Amino acid sequence: ECIGHRRSCKEDRNGCCKLYTCNCWYPTPDDQWCKCLL
């Protein structure tokens, strides 16, 4: 499992999530967080 700050799920394709399912939630209007799960 990998958790990281991302501006969007699409951008995270270049990060740790690229082989996993990316679930995003929005702690603030200006930020998104991705949690990558197997």
Swiss-Prot record:
Q: Give the protein's recorded name.
A: U9-ctenitoxin-Pk1a
S-S bridge residues: 2-17, 9-22, 16-36, 24-34
Question: What does the comment on domains in this protein's record state?
Answer: The presence of a 'disulfide through disulfide knot' structurally defines this protein as a knottin.
Q: Which family does it belong to?
A: Belongs to the neurotoxin 02 (plectoxin) family. 09 subfamily.
* GO cellular component terms, semicolon-separated: extracellular region
Report the superkingdom from the record: Eukaryota
Found, by tissue, as follows:
Expressed by the venom gland.
- UniProt keyword list: Disulfide bond, Knottin, Secreted
Source organism of the structure: Phoneutria keyserlingi
| Protein location | Secreted
Give the residue range of the signal peptide. Answer: none
